[in-house]
Amino acid sequence: MLYHCVYFWLKPELTAAQRADFRAGVETLKGIKAVAKVSVGTPAATTKRPVIDASYDVALIVECKDVAAEAAYQVDPLHLAFVEKFKTFWTRVQIYDSE
């Protein structure tokens, strides 16, 4: 299994409606057939510790069966449409891929 973990830092000036639209956009990625599972979340209210980075706004965890499935996800029309529509909403994106 390959885990494609994406963390988004949204522009602070986005309205609540824009943030909700972004979240809905991330949820559309669940429709990509190449992936096994898509999870979306925000920083958890866990105990604050120096090793925890909760500065991001939205987390996206995409589970793919292998590297080929992750490559298919990258070029899927739903993913490309999401990036095109929302690329102006974030100030930073950080990705961690692991197997």
Model-derived features with residue positions:
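Residue-identity detector for threonine
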Residues: 15, 28, 42, 46-47, ...
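A general secondary-structure junction signal
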Residues: 39-44, 97-99
